Amino acid sequence: MPFMTRKLTLVLTAGLTAAAWQPPILAHTPAANLFDAHVALGLPQAFALPRETDDERGPGVDEVVIKERLDTDAAYPDGSHATTYAGTAGSHEAVFTRLGPTLSVSVLGQSVEAGATIARHRSAPAPGQDDVIVPSFAQPARIHAALTDHPPAELRFWIFLHDDAGESNYAKFHNWYVAWWIRDMEKTVKPGIPVKVIIKDHLPGVTDFDYRQGRRDESLFAFRSAADGYLYEQGVMPSALTKVMLFVGDRPDNWKGAYGIAIPRDTVAMASGTGPRHGVAHEFGHTLNAQHEYAETRFPCVTNMSAYVPGLFSCQIYSGQNDVQIREYVQQTVEREAH
């Protein structure tokens, strides 16, 4: 009998220990619960939505209309997936994101950069014109046809959060950089194939990459190699339709004053968290053949490929011509890789 008692005690102890390792179940916020209840009834839905306590616009209540759920998948390092909806908040177009226990709202056409409640100040100038890297003969741009005989059915964007970026709040990162960009890509740019965004962090050899050393073109090529190595390990064949970005904290001296760098019509880019809200969209835009010359100033904001215009905020869209540039690039790349 003592043996049986001890055995039972060990089993119970092991069970309690295993239970202690289960991830905590986080309570959803009141706004998130209200949002979920209305969306569950089917779309569209119109209702009054109180803002989250950390809403970038401050406290308040919005009359919202949730029109549709977007198809684009955004996967985060903890295994969570952002669910993104398009609609309106008041008189403005808006994007609503459910990620984890919270609800985030990104309102287009409103300047919130100066007062945004993000981990650090996000109202820095937009990327300068010196962020485009022209490959040399010694380090050629990637040849699309040589990548893989089986191109993905998706336009994939891998964002690697550098260890020094300080981006541990995935919901805020998604709301600030990704949610509205997903909406624009899916609803306006319309590349013709599905879009997927994958965010990763804490990957030795990738997210601890030393981007401060050497020339910036050397840094880009070296990171592209490191990221491609990781993709191979995960069973993902690099492709001209698979883009990679290193998202860093402070911009290094070797960027020569830019808030990001990219190789046009290639697969690699870098962006700094000290830059503007459209920094990620800007640098990825270069890899999709979007160009500075087609950027527009739409007072009081600038489109994604614009250089710095003092006093203006991010429109959170590409210009009409850059929509065409991206659409044609993707279509031509799909056709090229299919042969």
Regions found by a protein language model. Give the residues of each.
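N-terminal prosegments of processed precursors
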Residues: 10-11, 23-107
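N-terminal secretory signal peptides that target proteins for export/translocation
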Residues: 1-5
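Surface-exposed flexible segments
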Residues: 97-104, 115-121, 172-175, 253-271
